[in-house]
Amino acid sequence: MSAFSGAELAYLRRDGERRLGRIATVGRDGTPHVVPVGWRYNAEHDAIDVGGRDLAATKKYRDAARSGRAAIVIDDLASVDPWRPRAVEVRGRAEAVSEPAALIRIHPDRVVSWGLD
């Protein structure tokens, strides 16, 4: 069974519509670090995979490897008039995967969504 609802999966699986998300990690000193990233839904692991150029050399990758925690929000605007934001936020265990290519895999502990109806 998926950690995501049917509406959340439909939103995440719309290829090419939402390729940018924002990942949040926590630095060694407790400071939050939030940056835009590319992502994809990984159906095999029911997780969000975050990738990027030279990812293993980044602060977000080191933070995720050290703390084992991360969050990501994937969002867009269904309409600007009226204002209708929609999003899926995933908080969970972060796995710093190194092979075959570096990525951060976020396994959901908590999923919150809004505006998907």
PLM segments and residue spans:
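Short, basic/aromatic recognition patches
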Residues: 1-22
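Short, structured beta-strand-loop surface elements
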Residues: 54-107
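Flexible glycine-rich active-site/ligand-binding loops centered on an Asp-His dyad
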Residues: 103-117
